[in-house]
Design a protein with these regions (language model features):
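Active-site-proximal helix/loop segments of hydrolytic enzymes
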Residues: 1-107
Length: 107
C-alpha cells in the first residue's frame, strides 16, 4: 500500500529495478493485468510500471517486481483494500500473471 499527498491518486502500481530487463518485463505484465482488471474498473485509470531504486529489487537474483495494491491516502482504495472480495481479485490477477510468466520460462 502506498500513501500520496494527493488523495485523488488511487489504484495498483508496480515497480522494477533499472538493472533488470526481466524484472521490467515482469512488472509491465503485472501492471497491464492490474490496469485491465482493477485500475480501469475501479478508478478509470491506467498506470505504467515504474523504475525504482529499492533494495529488495536490486538484490534479488530473480526477476522481481514490487506491487503496491492501492493508496491508503485514497478513501475508496482504503475501503476496497479491507474487503475480502477485492483482495481476492487482486490475488487472482497477480497469480494469473505469475503462472503465465513461469510457464513461459519453463518452456
Amino acid at each position: 500500500m502506498n500513501f500520496y499527498s494527493m488523495p485523488t491518486r488511487r489504484g495498483a502500481q508496480t515497480f522494477f529495478a533499472k538493472s533488470s530487463k526481466e524484472g521490467e518485463t515482469f512488472a509491465k505484465a503485472l501492471q497491464s493485468a492490474l490496469n485491465a482488471e482493477i485500475n480501469s474498473k475501479e478508478g478509470g485509470r491506467q498506470y505504467s510500471a515504474l523504475c525504482a531504486e529499492k533494495y529488495i529489487l536490486e538484490c534479488s537474483p530473480y526477476p522481481s517486481a514490487i506491487v503496491e495494491c492501492g493508496f491508503l491516502s485514497n478513501y475508496a482504495d482504503e475501503i476496497n483494500l479491507q474487503k475480502t472480495e477485492y483482495q481476492m481479485r487482486l490475488a487472482s490477477v497477480l497469480c494469473g500473471v505469475c503462472k503465465r510468466v513461469l510457464k513461459r520460462r519453463c518452456r
